């Protein structure tokens, strides 16, 4: 009888562990659930007419050029003209990375038209850094969809050989090396390509070999589920019934605009169907709606922060998180110091065995306790 009771207690504990693992703060259940989204997609819509997008004032058309391979990861940072401190903090931290895990990384800043007195400053900044993409629309939160589409269209026109594009914001810290590793695991280059960096000639040959290969469709981010439009006119997230009628129900699942990854094939698919989607001012929702119309569902990744801010922590920022939101310029550079050596070279992040065992779960608890 005591043995039978012991077995019952053991089974109950195991059941609680399974439930906690799947549906608790680890986020594993969310990732597994997102895999079912593809089976719920409607038939893809037919391509729409070409998008009518604002012209580029600063095109930086040769940003992806050079004698080496094209970017494995191209990062588009949405920023405002007056956010110079944020851009400089990124340039001095994770945005300075040009290679991760042996692959080229490129970071560019997206913005619209500034106030007249900022025009000269922006031109000087662009000439100095050559990392600015500017389109001819008034820069505002309600124009984020225009800004993002202008960036994706630039990628398709000037950098179609990039494999993956991360769209993010200027208050987000990005763990570039771990993000590249994540993308390699999810469908990046072959192991042979990864190891080919040992000799320049071999690297070039292998990149050429993979140049014509199609990149698998990927739309990766912190997925929001069953979000309904905000009808409050004063809210910057306001969506009118004309744009999204009530009988349409909630928005389809979409990835948080603070940081999502699109493969180049996903970028091209979204651009083909975007003109048939309602012109929503919420850029991340618009991308999700367009992706759904194209037959593409988002994949949930718990390592991407979404709207969550994580306190500075060497193990979380260096190993387990791919992004952290609401990071000001000072915190951006402090986070960089945590995961970098004294000479600016990135060192292996320090995690104790317990920190490593708890992984992302520990980081989420830290964020929860500090909120």
From Swiss-Prot:
Pathway: Protein modification; protein glycosylation. Keywords: Glycoprotein, Glycosyltransferase, Golgi apparatus, Lipid metabolism, Membrane, Signal-anchor, Transferase, Transmembrane, Transmembrane helix. This is Beta-1,3-galactosyltransferase 4. Residues 1-4 are cytoplasmic. The gene is B3galt4. Its EC number is 2.4.1.62. It comes from Mus musculus. It comes from the Eukaryota. Expressed in heart, brain, spleen, kidney, lung and testis. PANTHER family: BETA-1,3-GALACTOSYLTRANSFERASE 4, BETA-1,3-N-ACETYLGLUCOSAMINYLTRANSFERASE. InterPro entries: Glyco_trans_31. It is a single-pass type II membrane protein. GO terms for cellular component: Golgi membrane. It is found in: Golgi apparatus membrane.
């Amino acid at each position: 009888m005591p043995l039978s009771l012991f077995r019952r207690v053991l089974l109950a504990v195991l059941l609680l562990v399974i439930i906690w693992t799947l549906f608790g703060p680890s986020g594993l259940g969310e990732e597994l659930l997102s895999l079912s989204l593809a089976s719920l997609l409607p038939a893809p819509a037919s391509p729409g007419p070409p998008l009518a997008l604002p012209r580029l004032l600063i095109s930086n058309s040769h940003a992806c050029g050079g004698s080496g391979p094209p970017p494995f990861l191209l990062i588009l940072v949405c920023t405002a003209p007056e956010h110079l401190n944020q851009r400089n903090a990124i340039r001095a931290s994770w945005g300075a990375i040009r290679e991760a895990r042996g692959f080229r990384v490129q970071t560019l800043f997206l913005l619209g038209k500034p106030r007249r007195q900022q025009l000269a400053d922006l031109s000087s900044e662009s000439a100095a850094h050559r990392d600015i993409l500017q389109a001819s629309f008034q820069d505002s939160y309600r124009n984020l969809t225009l800004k993002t589409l202008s960036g994706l269209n630039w990628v398709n026109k000037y950098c179609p050989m990039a494999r993956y594009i991360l769209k993010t914001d200027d208050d987000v810290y990005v763990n570039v090396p771990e993000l590249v590793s994540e993308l390699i695991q999810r469908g990046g280059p072959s192991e042979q390509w990864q190891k080919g960096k040992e000799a320049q000639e071999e690297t070039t040959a292998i990149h050429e070999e993979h140049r014509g290969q199609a990149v698998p469709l990927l739309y990766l981010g912190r997925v929001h589920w069953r979000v309904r439009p905000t009808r409050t006119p004063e809210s910057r997230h306001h969506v009118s019934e004309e744009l999204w009628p009530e009988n349409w129900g909630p928005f389809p699942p979409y990835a948080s605009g603070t940081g999502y990854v699109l493969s180049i094939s996903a970028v091209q698919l979204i651009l083909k169907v975007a003109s048939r989607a309602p012109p929503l001012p919420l850029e991340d929702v618009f991308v999700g709606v367009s992706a759904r119309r194209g037959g593409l569902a988002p994949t949930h990744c718990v390592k991407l922060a979404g709207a969550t801010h994580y306190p500075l922590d060497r193990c979380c920022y260096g190993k387990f998180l791919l992004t952290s939101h609401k990071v000001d310029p000072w915190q951006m550079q402090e986070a960089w110091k945590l995961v970098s050596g004294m000479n600016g070279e990135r060192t292996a992040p320090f995690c104790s065995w317990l920190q490593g065992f708890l992984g992302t779960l520990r980081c989420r608890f830290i964020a929860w306790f500090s909120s």
